[in-house]
């Protein structure tokens, strides 16, 4: 696998940064994967890490000194990072390995007293700064936040995005921006706040019924929102909101202001007033100039948007049928393409091209919801692998093809993973596949108390794998937006997350269910559906929830070891396939329908 940037370009980038560090009397430079909104997915302007290191993964932290450059990534990216950093001067630092200290500890241990660490305060969260200062300050190390040294060294840095912001009609949103603002203001008053700052892009888009295209795959736009008790201000780049939309917003007492004025406006808030903001989603550059009192808590909109309304869920169910129909047509094509691959070569890139074309035929299709993961055999062992023109595999011979894909529609966001056997699967592959399927079914069938901390559900999914002394490094579930980000919170199904009040499972939340098992250098398996919390009933012990499975697409049964499935697990699988067939058959014809009918026949041992 080749790197996304050449070894020489990475070396040139590091050399330029080190020269700038020397000129600024800076001993270390910290480059987080972040922007002024602490987004998971970044606009091109903020893609500093790939330019600096050549690593193309979506998450990672870089530390550079005059004689060291390190990239910190978690286990999802170890295999990918090893390949992409090969031949560079960047060391791979594995988060979670005892021999590799966290980047904060590394800085504290390696830098001398009196050293200075530079990091762009516009992209550093308050919580991250506090963690850094707790380790660096006692050792006499200074943190400098007003320098963007990597950005100054990037000669062809892309501009900030200028695409127009779009209005999301209430017929799709389900509630007006006035109603949503009223809910947020109620929460502000409950916490004694006259003002509330929102910097998270999906919160801003949800709250104001707006969408954009500033970040690949995520229908959001660069913005901050400052909410008062009677009006609100939307800070965006010039030209992004046209006159007609500006007038619509003004009807809701939302007024458009220049993007770069937000810090100044915040600094001018009355000292006697109180500002509510989320310290985990707000940067130092915005908060350091405040004079007002503050309340630090999660954005109320984060809770509100996670609990989808009945209106939104009805749209999502329709979108799942559309997406499922496109997927059936795709898998019917794939089956034929694999059969003919000796004559017409098939590769990982062709998977994404065909999926995109078929989804684009569906009403309301907007875009992919993330870069498609099409990974054959060893590539599947990298959970976040992406095929590129420079590096992709041919699909031929025997093996497992993992396809993780999703789409944005006007009425919802999809995310699904299926594994397709190519040729004849081996017994070890079948064993792994069956274990992952058992894990997915276990979580799908679970009933649990309303309000339980979502990380506590993780062990249920992992138990079938733990029984085999197997494990996977990523979380089992993440929240999913409503025609918004494919990753949202506050819920997360991962035992590595800290159970807290904000992770409570509530009705209407959409979460992924995606256990996996990865054999580096051999294969990867992940099976994923989206599920929604719904009431399972009440008893003397309170209300309980269960999952409604939203995703509609057959699960491959070729790799199942029937002897390893219990009767109740087989019953769940057959009931799921019956529902898939019932809802998708009316939307299909020809080869797609034939494939669906074949792939939803009852499974028997």
Model-identified regions with their sequence ranges:
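Active-site neighborhoods and metal-handling regions in enzymes and metal-associated proteins
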Residues: 1-605
